[in-house]
């Protein structure tokens, strides 16, 4: 999901079977990275706004999904969940309908990746999520308090805060409490 940065970062993983892109911003969508890692067998899922900006050579590999739509590819059911801002001062960052969060169902498990979103009703309404990747990164998404409040509502079994640079992940974990198992990872080693 959202491969950005040097293509060398992805080399150890081989050619991806499936790539999902959540939004048009450079920390989610990098044309050069996609051109380097996407090969003939790779399935790419994006919102329409990303597909419109994709290089011509990649457009034929892309399946677009609008909010609320789903598709099955490679045995994975992929549901496009809205991701957007609610706060008036943040509406310019992520307007409703442009980007996607995703729920992927495979091997009997449901995994949610929020994309850049605030504490929206569509996220709170999610059910039976085994693992969730929830963002928190002001001014673009949520505070740790907002993210924890949402997680306490939809109760994924496990939650990984991601896209959190500068946010207090320890505070997030404390606020989630026993509603979900919080697993902290250092996504920013470099």
Regions found by a protein language model. Give the residues of each.
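Glycine-/small-residue-rich active-site loops that bind phosphorylated ligands and cofactors
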Residues: 26-29, 139-142, 167
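Proline-aspartate-enriched helix->loop->beta-strand connector
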Residues: 129-134, 138-161
């Amino acid at each position: 999901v959202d491969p950005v940065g040097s293509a060398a970062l992805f080399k150890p993983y081989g050619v991806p079977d499936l790539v999902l892109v959540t939004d048009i911003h450079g920390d989610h969508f990098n044309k050069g990275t996609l051109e380097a890692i996407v090969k003939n067998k790779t399935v790419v899922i994006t919102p329409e706004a990303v597909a419109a900006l994709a290089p011509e050579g990649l457009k034929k590999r892309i399946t677009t999904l609008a909010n609320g739509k789903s598709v099955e590819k490679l045995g994975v059911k992929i549901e496009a969940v809205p991701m957007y801002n609610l706060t008036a001062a943040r509406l310019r960052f992520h307007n409703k309908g442009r980007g996607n969060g995703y729920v992927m169902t495979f091997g009997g498990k449901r995994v949610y990746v929020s994309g850049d979103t605030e504490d929206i009703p569509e996220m709170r309404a999610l059910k039976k999520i085994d693992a969730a990747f929830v963002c928190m990164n002001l001014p673009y998404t949520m505070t740790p308090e907002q993210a924890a409040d949402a997680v306490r509502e939809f109760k994924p079994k496990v939650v990984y805060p991601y896209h959190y640079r500068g946010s207090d992940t320890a505070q997030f974990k404390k606020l989630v409490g026993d509603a979900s198992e919080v697993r902290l990872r250092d996504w920013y080693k470099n």
